[in-house]
UniProtKB/Swiss-Prot annotation:
The chain crosses the membrane at residues 10-32, 45-67, 77-99. Keywords: Cell membrane, Membrane, Transmembrane, Transmembrane helix. It is found in: Cell membrane. It is a multi-pass membrane protein. GO terms for cellular component: plasma membrane. This is Uncharacterized protein YvlA. It comes from the Bacteria.
Length: 108
């Protein structure tokens, strides 16, 4: 992988801050090198995971809102616990993307 390809691959990972899904898709279709495409797919998957998690959290929030009755606080704790776990996973994914972007830049 040459320096330009490494920069494109690292931008796919760093795009978690700017345009999470668009940059890896564009890089995948524009670049011809196999390793850069592999990095684009890996970063795309890591950008899609928080979105899917958000959908699950939203569905749980709606389900918890429906299930809340006057006496039980269990749905509230489940919603709060789910939100905490979701945000920890998102922070972990962001850190992973930054580490991978730095690794790709250093390797070139």
């Amino acid at each position: 992988m040459n320096r330009n390809q490494a920069i494109i691959a690292s931008l796919c990972y760093f795009s978690v801050f700017i345009a999470p899904i668009i940059v890896p898709i564009v890089a995948y279709f524009v670049v011809n090198e196999k390793e850069t495409k592999r990095h684009a797919i890996r970063s795309l998957i890591s950008h899609i995971v928080p979105f899917v998690g958000w959908l699950f959290l939203f569905i749980a929030l709606l389900g918890g809102a429906v299930a809340i009755d006057g006496d039980s606080l269990l749905p509230v704790f489940v919603i709060i616990g789910g939100a905490v776990i979701y945000f920890l996973v998102v922070i972990g994914i962001i850190i992973w993307n930054v580490i991978q972007g730095i690794k790709v830049l250093r390797a070139a």
